[in-house]
Amino acid sequence: MIFLKNICKNIGENAILKNVSLSIEKGEFVAIIGQSGSGKTSLLNIIGTLDTPSSGTYVFDEYEVTKLNNDEKARLRREKIGFIFQRYNLLSLLSAKENVSLPAVYAGKNLQERSQNAKKLLNDLELAHKLDSKPNELSGGQQQRVSIARALINGGELILADEPTGALDSKSGIMVLEILQKLNEQGHTIVLVTHDPKIAAQAKRVIEIKDGEILSDTKKEKAQEKLILKTMPKEKKTLTLLKNQAFECFKIAYSSILAHKLRSILTMLGIIIGIASVVCVVALGLGSQAKVLESIARLGTNTIEIRPGKGFGDLRSGKTRLNFSDLETLRSLEYLEAVDAHSNTSGVATYTNISLSARAEGVGVNNFAIEGLRIDAGRILNNDDVKNSTNVAVLDFNAKKNLFPDEKSENILGRVVLFNSQSFKIIGVLQKDTDKPIEDNVVRLYIPYTTLMNKLTGDRNLREIIVKVKDDVSSTLAENAIIRILEIKRGQKDFFTFNSDTFKQAITANKRTTTILTACVAVIALIVGGIGVMNIMLVSVSERTREIGIRMAIGARREDIMMQFLIEAVMICTIGAILGVILSIFVIFAFNTLSTDFPMILNAYSVLLGLLSSMFIGVVFGFFPARNAANLNPISALSKE
């Protein structure tokens, strides 16, 4: 079963083992005796594949161990070797049954099978009443019996016992030795390391070692031929194994987080703030953007204004005029939903003893809908008003507020106001326009543009034509077509256009830029949170080095250890992300309750992005600590206090 030839182990210039050669057959009970520093524990660690010899040959059950990689050695420990340590090496967060079951988890056995086997072993060792007890609730002898049960859960063809009675009282020590003798009688190969000749005398074969060399190897009697346990089948990556790995990792991660609540919360704080920032920034951006786009829609979405001149502020624009012929040409275009004229003039509005500087806006029937003007009381202009040049007016909010400060809108309908000595009957009052990007205090009276031209200015030319493009038509294409048609008709391009979509696109682009910049700040917060997670995970690896060594000793693969710490990092980040989302929901609710300007809009994609990014942060910043844990040397890890 075990064959060692010329095994040497050097640490620096010190020779721990010197050309050790021996063989151990299946079913033997061998005691390796020696004083402290003799090399007996180093030899046991090499036999148990926890340590690697500096030179020599080691064959275990027809496998040349010196040529196996770390995971292949872990498989040997998992399937064929069971360890009994002097200090028990039980995991403090697990119950007796869970400690015993742990090697079976890494072996891929299902929950029912490993639970039944663990209960049977503990029952056989008179611990049926301690299944759910934690190690600190057990006596030394009971802990050692749990350790023996753990060594047997996967079969334990070879049992390696390192000073198993060293920390026990005499009664418990005798019980442990009796258990080992009984296991040997059942066919288990036992290798016992001790410094006590009386304990060594219980074995059938004693090997004495001193200063790294074998002094004697005596067989007291021939080993009994007993039933040899079957070799476990070749390992396969089954679904059960993957489920076991994931479940065990989640359970340990959860226990670790609960065991250090304050530290875990402080670690999550960076993630919580980062995720809440991401969700709130997106919600703020969507809310403000929706408000602006709604305002633009009310101001006139898909609208194009045609004005004389080369552009805003053109001094020669006064010499250029648009006319009714241009208006009719545009009305004939089928891709335009509405076309109307717009002119204005300044003057004085008077009601009783109140006189104000005001502006008369000459508009058509469609202007109110095109510009998004909403009626508060009364009605808007109709076709008869425009056709007959009627002296009627619709007051805006500023006109109503200044001319009729203490009256309701519906109470002033039918009254007459003067504008530049012309009397106008009030037929409607507009709502306050809260959608304008910049609030102004201009007093406006909306009258038929025909009334303005015929009775106020005498000018038959138009200051502006405003059109609304159909929803299924590109406003840019429509604008280009209008420019070409009017340019051909007028013989020159002595006018300019303003497309509301240009303003809309500029606002959207500005909001997008602002959102990106703010999101960058949130991402930085996430990265800072991720660095905090990595720092805590490095501390966790350092604190749990001994636990890692124990898991490796009972057969955990490197990927098992790595997955354990990666899942813990991801779990911390995910819990932090969930708390961050919950916090952001409260913030959004509070903001929407208190703010009347615009709402914050919670976006499902931003929540999903936050959760996914937190997992990504967990993987990225948890990888380095997890890799460090997986690369630990089992012997160094086990010796860590």
UniProtKB/Swiss-Prot annotation:
Entries under CDD domains matching the protein: ABC_MJ0796_LolCDE_FtsE
Membrane topology note: Multi-pass membrane protein
Gene name per UniProt: macB
Name assigned to this protein: Macrolide export ATP-binding/permease protein MacB
Subunit structure: Homodimer.
Keywords noted in UniProt: Antibiotic resistance, ATP-binding, Cell inner membrane, Cell membrane, Membrane, Nucleotide-binding, Translocase, Transmembrane, Transmembrane helix, Transport
Location(s) in or outside the cell: Cell inner membrane
Pfam hit, one: ABC_tran
Function (record text): Non-canonical ABC transporter that contains transmembrane domains (TMD), which form a pore in the inner membrane, and an ATP-binding domain (NBD), which is responsible for energy generation. Confers resistance against macrolides.
Family membership: Belongs to the ABC transporter superfamily. Macrolide exporter (TC 3.A.1.122) family.
GO molecular function: ATP binding; ATP hydrolysis activity; transmembrane transporter activity
EC number per UniProt: 7.6.2.-
GO terms under biological process: response to antibiotic
Assigned GO CC terms: plasma membrane
PANTHER family named in the record: MACROLIDE EXPORT ATP-BINDING_PERMEASE PROTEIN MACB, MEMBRANE COMPONENT OF TRANSPORTER-RELATED
Residues annotated as domain ABC transporter: 2-236
Enzyme class: translocase
Binding site for ATP: G34, Q35, S36, G37, S38, G39, K40, T41
Regions that span the bilayer: 265-285, 519-539, 571-591, 604-624
Superkingdom assignment: Bacteria
